[in-house]
Amino acid sequence: IELGRSFVTLEYQSSRMGTKGLFALDNLWDGLGALTVIMPGARYFFGKFTMYPSYDRMARDMILYFLKMYFSDSESLILPMHPLSLWHDESIFETLFVGNDFKQDYRTLNREVRNLGYNIPPLVNAYMGLSPTMKLFGTAINDEFGDVEETGILIAVDEILEEKRVRHIDSFAQKHP
């Protein structure tokens, strides 16, 4: 199942709409969970997340380094034709992250990105929290879509965390046997 581009319009983002906007992204996940029930043969979510050229380079590099550290595709299933390189030397990040404790390194990432005045993009957070075995395929610039930086990902449906499975898949399956 392709994870297409998704965008929650500013009108429905929680900071502007209070509780009405709080569940907008959650509803997108409910829809994807429903698709796995309707299409039981679907084995993977495949797609990308986008970061804009205006996003802080240090924050972007930290996020991409972190994702590569925890979700790297060791099989080289898909490679960008023109991979995006980090602007900063990786040695900066090697000392920042422990490398063997996802939760601790995530807290560090979140703190450091916030210290730069940014947040980890919501979809990046959502994908990281969906499956510990997500595969990251690298990042490339899409020169046909405003030079955005797109990072390919793959998530195995059968490896979605139990908490997310119950919330977004099992809940739909119970209501629609």
What are the language-model segments listed below?
Residues 1-134, 138:
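Acyl-donor binding region in acyl/amide transferases
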Residues 1-6, 131, 135, 145, ...:
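Non-catalytic substrate-recognition and accessory regions of acyl/acetyltransferase enzymes
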Residues 141-143:
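Internal catalytic domains of large membrane-associated glycosyltransferases
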